[in-house]
Amino acid sequence: MWWSNLFVDMNKANFFNFSFLPKYASYFVDGVLNTLALSIVAVLLAVIPALLLALMRLSKNRFIHGLSGAYIAVFRSTPLMVQLAIIYFGIFYIIQVPRVYIGFIRLDMFIPFVVSLALNSSAYVAEIFRAGILAVDSGQTEAARSLGLSQWQAMKLVVLPQAVKDVLPALANEVVTMVKESSVCSAYGMGELMFAAKNVSGTTLISVGPFVFIALIYFCINFPASKAIEAIERRMRRGDKR
């Protein structure tokens, strides 16, 4: 049967050769830790600038509106790998970060990449926040203004708390997306999962097995996380209906 031949061919191509694990398991443990640290910290760092960008996008001042629009357009219209190269080889060539380890994190590698990912993520999270703010009934803002609150006070005390609550699942989804996108950092030597697989593949000459293994790791991280986010969204929707 053709599928049995396919299985044999895949086996010959080392698809299922995980013999490297006993010796190189620590590479993948470090890779998982670096991947999760990059992803979570990047999205957390992106939240404040993203919120500012969203408010700027909603501003009636044409300059402020245009400035935020230009930022979002640049980061959403250029490849992440190009952004990483400009920030890592450009900005952080000027700003020298000491080669210091904090636990498993090497700061001179981690900081440039987490800043790059955060700047990229902020462009997407800004649109998430903007949609969340626009989804809040405008009547609530008008009611707050009628009670004597300023536009800023109405935004801070009435609109933003509701908008942030509504966009939390989307922010969690952004972390899942960032887990996958952080793999591009391997091109510049960041020791995350993709970098670990490349190193192990090059050292052991097992061409495909290490990449199949990290694909399984990515799946085991992202699939349960996605299902948990869906469950949270359903629970929040039920809560809103009560």
Placement of each model-derived feature along the sequence:
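Transmembrane alpha-helices and adjacent helix-loop boundaries
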Residues: 1-242
